[in-house]
């Protein structure tokens, strides 16, 4: 306890953890997948549960934002306790990725299950991404009994994973999203136990490539050797995307050195589950390959499956590509570079049909202001060690929309996930210790930010954070 007999912040959070765990398990048991072809009822169920939990936590104003072609967004407000207090916007999402092949899971994906041999770990789809962070927001509110020392605006999205027109909505209603700082909690730490602030997000886009060569399949014995094989044409085109070292070979995609914190090669090999004896691809530092340079991944392929393959020349093949690009490169510019490269390919003289898909811009955060100072103090208090600065290869499309709506706000990116959570993969898991520390960090952050925001500001030298361009 403190000198005045009150509980310490950590003791308060520890007393809340049983209830927060129970609520996390309830939320993670709901298959709130907001992809086409999935039932909408679980998404509504997750929405309603969160609204109920937020009301119980003391949020007086909760609205449902309904836009065409997207799941409902939860918007909540707690007014500032006094006119001089800052306002903090908290972001998360309650939808999840599809579970994929259930046979690859060690337990049912929507039955939260302790992970044997990993103390305090729970396994379920969405339990880390992003329901852990939504529960961390809830925990912070419970610490303060719904009356934190700052104003609060909550934005909890329902269709982040599939993509949503809500990404472009905040700039159309800037008053609603006005704030002094925002905490984007859709990520987490470089490794368990290492508090991490993310300062850059790579952008993302998708491109479809199709090849049609025959009206229908033909016997490979009679026609193979002269009839053009659509799958072979496609594979030759895809092979031009990288050079012999594995570096992306598409002209016009930005790549800069990275000089900030990153993984060791041993950590990365373990995290990426690279088989023993195989090399990593690409050149340069891991930070450069993962964060400040491009990556092109073939994420889907339409072609005959091996088990049912006939001895026939393939008439049609299609691939879906995912491009991740430098945080500061324009999204349309990056997508155009990839499309232009593919359209220039003519394997065996055969053209490709290239269809541009959706884009999500990258983002680089400003550092050094009062919110960042408060976050550094809070993260150290929660984890007991100084925070690291990193970037991430993932993207959070709404960040740019929120930043345009509140251009003066400091944007902080931290949360309860860690690099071993198996995000978007089978056997996703979260560590309750990271959830607990994130609640402590969020509660300490609003306390420190409220004090620093209203205190006279003496000149300070901001702590520099590495940018995606490598500057210190």
Short names for language-model regions:
Residues 214-217, 221, 226-271:
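Polar, glycine-rich mid-to-C-terminal structural blocks
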Residues 2-102, 316, 320, 333:
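N-terminal helical capping/dimerization or prosegment-like subdomains
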Residues 95, 241-245, 339-349:
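A common structural junction motif
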Residues 128, 215-217, 323-330:
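A generic structural motif
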């Amino acid at each position: 306890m403190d000198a005045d007999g009150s509980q310490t912040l950590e003791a308060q959070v520890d007393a809340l953890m049983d209830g927060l765990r129970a609520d996390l398990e309830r939320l993670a048991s709901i298959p709130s997948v907001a992809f086409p072809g999935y039932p909408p009822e679980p998404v509504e169920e997750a929405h309603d549960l969160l609204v109920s939990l937020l009301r119980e936590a003391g949020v007086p104003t909760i609205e449902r934002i309904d836009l065409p072609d997207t799941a409902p967004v939860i918007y909540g407000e707690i007014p500032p306790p006094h006119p001089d207090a800052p306002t903090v916007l908290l972001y998360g999402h309650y939808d999840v990725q599809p579970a994929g092949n259930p046979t690859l899971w060690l337990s049912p994906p929507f039955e939260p299950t302790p992970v044997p041999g990993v103390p305090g770990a729970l396994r379920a789809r969405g339990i880390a991404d992003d329901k852990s962070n939504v529960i961390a927001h809830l925990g912070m509110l419970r610490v303060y009994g719904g009356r934190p020392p700052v104003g609060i605006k909550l934005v909890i999205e329902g269709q982040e994973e599939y993509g949503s027109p809500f990404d472009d909505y905040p700039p159309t209603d800037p008053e609603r999203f006005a704030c002094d700082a925002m905490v984007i909690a859709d990520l987490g730490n470089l490794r368990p136990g290492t508090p991490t602030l993310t300062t850059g997000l790579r952008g993302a886009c998708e491109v479809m490539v199709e090849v049609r060569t025959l009206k229908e399949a033909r016997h490979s014995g009679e026609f193979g050797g002269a009839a053009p094989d659509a799958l072979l044409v496609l594979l030759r085109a895809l092979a031009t995307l990288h050079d012999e070292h594995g570096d992306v070979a598409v002209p016009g995609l930005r790549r800069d050195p990275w000089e900030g914190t990153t993984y060791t090669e041993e950590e990365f090999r373990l995290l990426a589950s690279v088989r023993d004896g195989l090399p990593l691809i690409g050149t340069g530092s891991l930070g450069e390959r993962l964060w400040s340079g491009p990556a092109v991944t073939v994420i889907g392929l339409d072609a005959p499956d091996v088990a049912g393959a006939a001895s026939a020349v393939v008439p049609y093949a299609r691939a879906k590509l995912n491009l991740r690009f430098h945080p500061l490169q324009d999204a349309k510019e990056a997508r155009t570079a990839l499309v232009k490269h593919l359209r220039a390919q003519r394997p065996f003289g055969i053209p490709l049909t290239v269809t541009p898909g959706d884009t999500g811009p990258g983002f680089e955060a400003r550092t050094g202001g009062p919110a960042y100072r408060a976050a550094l103090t809070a993260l150290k208090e929660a984890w007991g060690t100084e925070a690291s600065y990193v970037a991430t290869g993932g993207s959070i499309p709404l960040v740019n929309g929120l930043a345009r709506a509140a251009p003066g706000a400091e944007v902080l990116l931290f949360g309860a996930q860690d690099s071993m959570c198996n995000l978007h993969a089978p056997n996703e898991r979260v560590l309750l210790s990271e959830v607990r520390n994130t609640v402590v960090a969020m509660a300490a952050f609003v306390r420190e930010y409220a004090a620093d925001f209203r205190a006279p500001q003496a000149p300070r030298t901001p702590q520099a954070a590495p940018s995606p361009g490598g500057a210190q």
